[in-house]
Structure formats: C-alpha cells, structure tokens
Amino acid sequence: MRLRISEAVVLFLLGAVAALIGDHSHVVTGTTVYHTDAVPFVWSSPFWFPILVGAATASLAELRLHLPAPRDGVTARQALGGVAAVVGTYVTTALVHAFPVVPVTALVCAAAAITWCVLGDGPGAACGVVIAVIGPAVEIALVQLGVFAYHPDSDGLFGVAPFLAPLYFAFGVVAALLGELAVARRPQLGPPVCDTVSRGPGAG
C-alpha cells in the first residue's frame, strides 16, 4: 500500500462528505429516489453510500500511485479546484436532470474533459476510465435490485443516467490527483550531511 493509513482515512472522509452533498442534491430534486428504509440514513443517503464513495476515493488514489510517474508538483490549490469541479458537476446534474438527455450528457462530458485537461494526466485518465465503467455498473445493479431509481427523464442507460459515465470519469481523475498530492506533501528527507573534514595535502 502506497498511501499511509492517515492519508487513506482523510481521502475516505473527503469522498464520503462530497458524496453526501451530491446525493442530497439528487434526492431533494427528485433525480433519484431510494426504495429502502431498512438501513440507517445519513442525511439523505443510506449509510452505505458514503462508505462506497469514500472507499472508491481512497482506492483510486492508491491505484494512481501504482501507475507510472506520479507527479510531485501537484498542489493543494489544484486539489481544491478538482474537488469543487466534481462536486459542482454532481450538483449540476441534479438541477438539470429533467432536461433533454443529449445536452445534459454533453454538458457533463465537457466538464469532465476540462477537468482532465486542466488537472489530469495519462494515468489519471486511466483511473477515470476504470471508475467510469465500474461506477455506473454498480448503480445499474442496484437499480435492478430495486434499491433506488432514477427519474424517468434520467434513466436512459439501463435504468441509470447517461451522465454518470463522464461524472465518474471526472471523479476518478480528481481522486488520482489527490493520491499524488498526498505523497507530494510528505516531508522530504534532506541529503545526508557529510561529517568528514577535508584535509589539505600532507595533513596528518
């Protein structure tokens, strides 16, 4: 494991909080409806939802550190911008869920592309692709199990919203960047100090 436990916990909590904000936006606007009350809820979400997203955040960050050439020049400012971009896009999907599917999906694709162009790299895109496949697949399975449903105007991808793929892609790019930042901010050990004294010619 490349992440330290403390770093993984921070990333888990960050992902969980962002998930709660986005999911609350989906629930209050009717983008999604949960059909279960058998488990405790945290705000508007069943307790397992922020756990899944938090775990995905830490896992994607860890994955990035196993891919080639993690960047050591990423900054907290970039990370803040990335998190804001993903949460903002997530909330935007809640506000436009009833609009025609093509412009909504194109809008989210554009936001995801900009996020990658500004903040990502090749391995970060790979992380984005991984979660862009896994995330919607998990949601499709949960919809088929009757756990929740998307609004009829937003369920064109096997029962889930087509905008999920680019939204998850942006999430993967930013989670990868967060992993790079976690390593880049670790205290750097300086070069060893030589404690020998140079002696002039003929010195005893």
Curated annotation (Swiss-Prot):
Residues that span the membrane, as ranges: 5-27, 47-64, 76-97, 101-118, 124-145, 162-179
GO molecular function: identical protein binding; lipid binding
Localization per record: Membrane
Entry membrane topology: Multi-pass membrane protein
Main location: membrane
GO cellular component, one term: membrane
Residues engaged in binding a 1,2-diacyl-sn-glycerol: 26, 150
Keywords, in A-Z order: Lipid-binding, Membrane, Transmembrane, Transmembrane helix
Family statement drawn from the similarity comment of this UniProt entry: Belongs to the INSIG family.
Record remark: domains: The KxHxx motif mediates association with the coatomer complex.
Subunit comment: Homotrimer.
Function statement: Diacylglycerol-binding protein.
Protein name in UniProt: INSIG protein homolog
